[in-house]
Amino acid sequence: MNRLKKHYEEIIRLDMIRKFNYVNPHMVPKIDKIIVNMGVKEAASDKKQILAPLLILELITGQKAIVTKAKKSISNFKIRKGFPIGVSVTLRGNNMYEFLSKLITLVLPKIRDFKGVPFTSINKYGHLAIGIKDLLVFPEIESEYDKFNRVYGANIVIVTTAKTKKEAGVLLSGFQIPLNKR
């Protein structure tokens, strides 16, 4: 069993039951999935530009990434329906906990001038959105730095089953995600 999953089952879950007085054990919030997404605007003009972000996401998540395509044409952005515009990975189960552990212990502390994730990054549905401007902070990418011609960023969304912002904040704080109450 993963370290974070065990921590959730043995400590966080019990703390949340005490704090929020849930009557049913299935009401206790948990992390449902983690979505890692990269938008690649250059891919609209040159389809080969999608390969590097695809490889990066597969390296950092350990799971096959999918290419996201434009749902409709937008002439101002020179995008046609069906053009590749990004890559995405949805993590669940053990892969999710492994990625979260890596994010908390290795990646977030390496980000320069990182003062924590703002509490306002949690939306009303209890989902936390984190933007990382430079993926070179991931250990898998550091050693492969010379293979990529530019710096890539990504959006990471941690989807929880929490009903309120407060529940989500307590849950994510239990996982040692540094939240700032700004």
UniProtKB/Swiss-Prot annotation:
Protein's cellular compartments: Mitochondrion
Alphabetic keyword roster: Mitochondrion, Ribonucleoprotein, Ribosomal protein
Chief localisation class: mitochondrion
A single GO cellular-component term on record: ribonucleoprotein complex
Domain of life assignment: Eukaryota
GO biological process: translation
InterPro entries: Ribosomal_uL5, Ribosomal_uL5_bac-type, Ribosomal_uL5_C, Ribosomal_uL5_CS, Ribosomal_uL5_dom_sf, Ribosomal_uL5_N
GO MF annotations, alphabetized: structural constituent of ribosome
Keyword Ribonucleoprotein: yes
NCBIfam families: PRK00010.1
Family label: Belongs to the universal ribosomal protein uL5 family.
PANTHER family the record matches: 60S RIBOSOMAL PROTEIN L11-RELATED
Designated name of the protein: Large ribosomal subunit protein uL5m
Species this chain originates from: Reclinomonas americana
Highest classification ranks of the organism: Eukaryota, Discoba, Jakobida, Histionina, Histionidae
Gene designation per UniProt: RPL5
